[in-house]
Amino acid sequence: MKFLVDAHLPRGLCGLFKAAGHEARHMLDLPAKNLTTDNAINLLSAKEKLVVISKDTDFYYSHLLRQQPYKLILVRTRNIGISELQKLFAKNLPAIEKALRKHSVVELDRSELRIVI
């Protein structure tokens, strides 16, 4: 799988996905960096079949209306430390991989991973 980590999440998440054999980029790796628009992210996601990882619910509504981004992990943890967030993703990575094989939107909070669409 290929992942794109949104600007409001730590770059370190990319390392976690790469260590598991996936491709991963952070918004800071894109040409416009943090100035990349949501629309540009959606188009890139659709073109390259990227799973967007974000706290931004605008991506959820965009997916409902236009099926963009291609796939989405919606992070619903509120304020969480970087280390705790990385542990949460590491713990849930097998379930995330399995869910995204069949579904297009999953939601991750501190207690569970939910399939949304």
Language-model region placement:
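N-terminal first-folded block
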Residues: K2-V51
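Ribonuclease/tRNase effector modules and their secretory precursors
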Residues: A19, A90-K91, A95
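Hydrophobic/aromatic beta-strand patches that form the interior of the parallel beta-sheet core
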Residues: R25, I53, I73-V75, V106
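Residues that scaffold the ATP/ADP-binding catalytic core of kinase and kinase-like folds
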Residues: M27, S62, V116
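Acidic, metal-binding active-site segment of PIN/NYN-like and related structure-specific nucleases
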Residues: S45-H63
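Mid-chain, well-packed structural core segment of small domains
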Residues: Y60-F89
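Charged phosphate-binding loop/patch that engages nucleotide di/tri-phosphates or the phosphate backbone
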Residues: A95-I117
